[in-house]
Amino acid sequence: MTRSEAREQAFIVLFERIFNSDLTIAEIIDAAQEEGLIKINGFAASLLQNAQENEDAIDKLISENLKGWAINRLPKVSLAIMRLAVSEMLYIEEVPVGVSVNDAVELAKKFGTADDATYINGVLGAIAKSL
């Protein structure tokens, strides 16, 4: 599995968690793997663990860089993608920030809209400059 594929699998879990916030990441992974819906490798597991453990800090950083939006009004796809990317940017040192941003934009193009991709690129670009 490539890192891009691992990010997509992690995105799916984070997106699901938005709708099932009473479940842990581990519970969502277990249920989805039992159904054969996802495969989580070590890289994806690390992204997810960091995203869950640091969700408040990640959301604060995202909120500080939103232009014209409140975090609770963001499309859920965009929120999950940004949480994933910021988790990677902050806590996975061996991945260049530009790679995290680019893959987030690609996820937005696949699962969201062109407008989502553009907005996510802008927000993550602002976050990258602040790091």
Model feature map: region roles:
Residues 1-117, 121-131:
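N-terminal interaction/assembly modules
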